[in-house]
């Protein structure tokens, strides 16, 4: 059994009470902001803008006032699986150093083309109980610079924040949870990988071919348009409907290592679905010889 560092950083009582005691999740009115909105709020005292990606890229130019974050800074060290959430105490310290407080309005933007690194940070903050305070900049840095908005290479001094996380128990799931819900009505297992990995035509290095039995394929890349912005809500909703996901259903998503799937997690939350991330994803499921796999496009939407 794989032990999740994030979940083992708490006592049992905290894990059972966290979701009800604090936190909660954002919604379509708070999870996404435009370049216009960010431009008009850049000088807000409680705003924390985080550029997600390599620090070398951040140093070449970023949104004024932004701070830099790489995914390696919010990934567990010394564990068998890649990109697992670390204990919440470590996450709290990382975001405190970035100036985050419990009353901060946090805006994340991607420094590069794809949004999956940014949605991974969103999920992390959501798991810490800060989801209601956090939004993605639609289109990321490319949208900002494409509109000729100001950028800087200045690395500002950051005043540490005062943040206390309250871990949410309704976000991260493990293989046991997925296995026990494979045929449960109203629970949809969603494979966020590209179709060739889902079908088994392409095999990840050292892993088994195929997908979790009964999973549907909603590739993470299908959620965004050619400019890297999320597609229209009506189009996103239509894709979820075509995959057999109904209003009131729960979405449990996975990918290779728990990064691409956060795009589906984010989109599902945006559309109002209850969502979970199987953090171990295919790297975990595939390594478990006691768990079944399915090959082919049997459940293709």
Show which residues each predicted segment covers.
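Bacterial N-terminal signal peptides
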Residues: 5-19
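Active-site neighborhoods of enzymes that stabilize oxyanions during catalysis
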Residues: 28, 32-33, 40, 75-77, ...
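Mature N-terminal segment immediately following signal peptide/propeptide cleavage
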Residues: 28-56, 65-71, 93
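Solvent-exposed loop/turn segments at secondary-structure junctions
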Residues: 54-57, 72-76, 112-116, 141-143, ...
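Helix-loop module immediately N-terminal to the HCX5R catalytic loop
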Residues: 76-104, 220-251
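Thiolate-centered catalytic microenvironments shared by cysteine-dependent enzyme domains
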Residues: 86-177, 181, 201-202, 260-276, ...
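C-terminal soluble interaction/assembly domains
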Residues: 236-238, 243, 248-298
